[in-house]
């Protein structure tokens, strides 16, 4: 990552001393780059597996990142298609310029980019769904800015206080689900739709995973060491959409429902309902819900909530999907973990004060800190899990290498695999598969209703006994499935080890995937040593041959396999043990690998043997270079390749000999199964990848004062709901999402290994320029700005002196291009920091005026949101500034991100928001069915008062002076009516007086916080005095004929003399708790 002394993940930034667009501005860019060069076998394929996670209004920042990924993907599509840029493109000039820049950079680096696997959690699920849909349909996502600016308005998301039922504070189905269901099928077509591609490439491989949380879990079972039945309730839900699903227009409602179901933060949004096999019809503003059985492994309908409530990231299935993707050229795999912030970074210069026992946390502070801790720990757990996976992959790769090294020393004809090791492998793998199948089977059976008639969805009576308490269904199923798998994988006594391709094929897909992984490990070591175009092309051909040897069919989900098996009449009439046996047989049939696939796998390496031998022999023998240098890496890779080749044997490089390919196949089988026999049963497939966290905790050259998500994003406030409050706040977060996203993508694209390869192939090594100078020159041609004389100012680190980024620093960073003995860095952050300005200038040209307009005139025809004077002054300066340095520099002065709810306290928008939120919250509290009857009258009164107050605030448009006047008038008239003896007048007057008092308090709070508590005290006194009014007195204490509310609902109050004292004590306790919740007030 970018250098940082305080642990923050730095990232490329922006500043441009050149005129608008620089010498390579928008017009210059369009003239400089007409069409990309053709894609060849030497072109590198950069594949992004993108995981998005983050809550509620932080979705807007993630949407900005999504927009940049979408532009990069479209640029890659342009390079694959070739030709000139379409003249009928609907992109804005600035977006088209950004797309061209991405196309120029990947053309310079000779790569294409593929965003093929995506996953989303919580609000990240919405953006992941949009990005996945755009990939398959060729849509342009520029329009999601307006989608989020409109959809995210808090005053629109808040439920109407007049609703009869208020299950949450915000509309989930009526707003979020409805908007997504409407907009997903109508995304604007981009300049490179799939219809322009050849038939085979029209539906690019795409897999989308979206998580959710089940409110009523699905139960499976297992037994402990003593045979005791343990109920395992699984609350994790996972939606899966493939490219085939995403290409069908009728999938859009299911995709919208999945995204809405993941973004269902409790209390804020109501739970989402998932139909299973039968959808639900449209009801009011809620669209029709489709059946979700094809897209999830659930077994019945469910109410679900936010996907981020549990540690529910589909890491395992994501890695498996990565492994299954075939390749035809060199592939670099990167996992983009998109999260607005993983938490505040420790700053030794500003260490927070230690916790003090004499300063206890209040009720609200403790609650908010607890929620923040859960969120932060969840994100950190994800990153740790991925990092742990990487560490495990490295350890397993090392173990595989040492096994090959050991096997190479064995006597000729002695195999690495022994019968005992094969037995261990069979037992471990069969046990693992049996546990998975048993869990899926019992999960299905636990949700089946008792058998009543011929329905195939019910539980057969013959299975019921083993599923009751004290039954041994788990043990019976596991043992039977294990036995069936072991029988299928058994060897004849006379030949304890498999040798022919047909014998290897009996071990199914798990063994084949392991052997395929071993073959790819050999090729990865060879790629490190490749220097010429011919070597790269040869290795790319071998990689494609390995993937082409056998491509697994799209296997159905286990839940589908179980449901199909359980519906067969013959199975239902038999025993549960027979059902488990049939399930294992169906599973083995589904994972069958043909024998000739093993032969083709072996032949791929046999054909490549001369190339591999030549690469190992030509590597440098110098091992004294620094550990991370190119020479040292070549030395290590050569040693690994020689070890594998020594184990695999000697081959002429032709698969004509019928012995060569089968021999190579069983040697791969031996290496794979021996390694797996020594690993835990739950060991995953070895699939290495780079992990890059894309966050807002980054710095920039144009805005050096903005370094963290807490500083930049309004969505970090109010437990991540902040950006919903104001349109300008949403526009601010969207802009920062694009700025941050562009910088991160440039950083990832500038892979030092690829840059070194390009410089070695294209730079003139005999010319006057060094490789580093040649590459910097190419980046300047692309659009990177020239350096100012003192360099770009950088923020001071650790209280030290100010620093400047200079061209010499970049040349030093790129020194590895000319000296193979220098360490090869993991990334080149300073170069990316400087280059990313070319993109970020285009972003500012498109977004800065838009942000200013949301401050001054957020929506034409509507009253503007109130903003502080500093924000309005800044917005005016932005609109008046000419494009170029002066305008870009205004980003560092951006006051929008610095606005807070406190600074907006006196605004009409705040008054309207508070009034509506209070009325909605009162309605939500009154909608709780489990409320004791004694609490219902006070809540009804509270709802009446807050609803009346909201209506008056709507009429006064939230203006403080008008609100106070209206409140005072209602207060006077209400008191006059309340003291009358007529019941109707008394009740109406009391409500009017309460509403008036509430309005006076609200209006006064807008003007001055100092008067707030005085007015609240006045309101309390007024409430006490109201007890003397006839209406309240009779309502509470009744008359001779009627007992009143106290006599009906609180008769115990007068039953003993000390009961009223208890009530007074409880009131005092509440007051103490409120004081404890705000310990800062004295």
From Swiss-Prot:
A motif (DGA/G) lies at residues 306-308. The chain crosses the membrane at residues 959-979, 982-1002, 1012-1032, 1057-1077. The active site is at residues 122, 306. Residues 50-319 form the PNPLA domain. Keywords: Cell membrane, Hydrolase, Lipid degradation, Lipid metabolism, Membrane, Transmembrane, Transmembrane helix. It is found in: Cell membrane. A motif (GXSXG) lies at residues 120-124. GO terms for cellular component: plasma membrane. GO terms for molecular function: hydrolase activity. It comes from the Bacteria. It is a multi-pass membrane protein. InterPro entries: Acyl_Trfase/lysoPLipase, DUF3376, Patatin-related_protein, PNPLA_dom. GO terms for biological process: lipid catabolic process. NCBIfam families: patatin-like protein. This is Uncharacterized membrane protein Rv3479. It comes from Mycobacterium tuberculosis (strain ATCC 25618 / H37Rv).
